[in-house]
């Protein structure tokens, strides 16, 4: 009997920009306060990209970290899906930029834009690709 392939997460990679923008920083150029922002959003600070950084450059670093964690190389990649609500451009997709940066040639690469739920959709799509052997 044929056992279907099962998807599993075998490596993790993450990165955030080093530059931090606090509510106090925002108070300097907007008519607002730390308390007002905190009360409505719960946010104290956020990480923002610096010159030369983008969704793709950060994604490439995260992908390399995930590959290292899984003890894999870009040659082991069969599919690249990027879930983002902040692509740096419409074309080429962020996934294709990361694919190029990794040197992962000849594999499908595409973006999913579904805001906060994008990760769940990307995980589901990736799982179906794996389970169907495509």
PLM regions: where:
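Conserved beta-strand segments that form the floor/walls of ligand-binding pockets within enzyme
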Residues: 8, 81, 111
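Conserved "HGTGT" condensation-loop signature of ketosynthase/thiolase-family condensing enzymes
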Residues: 1-78, 102
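Conserved catalytic cysteine-centered active-site region
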Residues: 38-57, 84-134
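Short glycine-rich or small-residue beta-strand-to-loop segments that form or flank ligand, phosphate
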Residues: 78-84
């Amino acid at each position: 009997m044929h056992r279907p392939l099962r998807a599993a997460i075998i490596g993790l990679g993450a990165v955030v920009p080093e530059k931090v923008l606090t509510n106090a920083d925002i108070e300097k150029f907007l008519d607002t306060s730390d308390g007002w922002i905190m009360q409505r959003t719960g946010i104290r600070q956020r990480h923002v990209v610096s010159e030369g950084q983008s969704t793709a450059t950060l994604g490439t670093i995260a992908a390399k970290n995930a590959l290292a964690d899984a003890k894999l190389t870009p040659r082991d990649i069969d599919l690249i899906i990027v879930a983002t609500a902040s692509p740096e451009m419409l074309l080429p997709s962020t996934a294709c930029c990361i694919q190029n940066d990794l040197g992962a040639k000849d594999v499908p690469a595409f973006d999913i834009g579904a805001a906060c739920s994008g990760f769940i959709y990307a995980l589901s799509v990736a799982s179906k690709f794996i389970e169907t052997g495509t």
